[in-house]
Amino acid sequence: MRLAFPEDSVGLVRPQMLHFSEPLTLACGRSLSDYELVYETYGELNAARSNAVLVCHALSGHHHAAGYHSPEDRKPGWWDSCIGPGKPIDTRRFFVVALNNLGGCNGSTGPGSLNPATARPYGADFPVVTVEDWVHSQARLADALGIQQWAAVIGGSLGGMQALQWTISYPERVRHCLAIASAPKLSAQNIAFNEVARQAILSDPEFHGGHFQEHGVIPRRGLMLARMVGHITYLSDDAMGEKFGRELKTDQLNYDFHSVEFQVESYLRYQGEEFSGRFDANTYLLMTKALDYFDPAAAHGDDLAKTLAVARADFCLMSFTTDWRFSPARSREIVDALIAAGKNVSYLEIDAPQGHDAFLMPIPRYLQGFASYMNRIAV
């Protein structure tokens, strides 16, 4: 048992849940008659309710962004390096809200939830959700918490897309937007990677058309392959070379197709197997489609500057030099559009070898720049 938490930790945290009974109409044309959102909070909301920060998660993220659920927990929340006393999102100043998005598999209504119309798990019948849908549901969460305006909406990768969408859908409710390792829309290559991952899941015999829960099975192999493909794109070539090179697990080659011979093979298989035991296959499909569909400028003739003209927030964009999934050039597209739209924008490009996953890591230059911007936010 852990005797004490680090001084800069938010410590023990407890997930909370809110039930929403007002129907939510989705971009796909369907609606959810009622739904639940699981969330966590860190820090204290001030009397003026002016210090609230929303943290939006990426593809495999969830509401547990910081702290520990139990003294026995070996690892803290997924963004613990950035949230806590004295950290970039300083909980001595800010009241932080992190949630699990609709369609997720960590407590919020999603494919694993019971469909009230059938009393069986939604499975593949859960509606396709978009980034815009998530933002609308997050706005309802803010209403329920009595938060009329966020001091900042922050996210990395897919989370950064949500932060951008907030400034478009609810411009008057966001003072600062921080989009980290993100993009204004996916490239064809990124959509292609997502499609390969989806096909790995869809072609797994245990998927059963998305209703695998009713068969008492999990499409582990499909999920494993999807995660392996995705994980390769989250790392840089340099990082993989530095960590694994061509190192073998044993001293010899086996000259077959079934043995795990290289350390990088072992790593990918471990990541895939671990992921397949904790993530929902239908949620993976939904998250990748939300990524594919995000393209707010499409409604404005592909003019991103025109799209962002409605925003009232100040912006901070950060990218990482070796991120080839959402390269610095994609962040600079957003920066250029914001400048063209006459918005206040700060941009930091961090030299880091870790690739796309760098936004999750305690890289000194990243934490320094992140904290510097957050310290400028008046509460």
Curated annotation (Swiss-Prot):
GO terms for molecular function: homoserine O-acetyltransferase activity; homoserine O-succinyltransferase activity. Its EC number is 2.3.1.46. Its main location: cytoplasm. Pathway: Amino-acid biosynthesis; L-methionine biosynthesis via de novo pathway; O-succinyl-L-homoserine from L-homoserine: step 1/1. PANTHER family: HOMOSERINE O-ACETYLTRANSFERASE. Transfers a succinyl group from succinyl-CoA to L-homoserine, forming succinyl-L-homoserine. Keywords: Acyltransferase, Amino-acid biosynthesis, Cytoplasm, Methionine biosynthesis, Transferase. This is Homoserine O-succinyltransferase. It is found in: Cytoplasm. The active site is at S157 (nucleophile), D323, H356. It holds the Pfam family Abhydrolase_1. One of its GO terms (cellular component) is cytoplasm. Homodimer. The keyword Amino-acid biosynthesis applies. SUPFAM superfamilies: alpha/beta-Hydrolases (SSF53474). The record marks R325 as: Important for acyl-CoA specificity. Residues 51-360 form the AB hydrolase-1 domain. HAMAP family: MetX_acyltransf. Belongs to the AB hydrolase superfamily. MetX family.
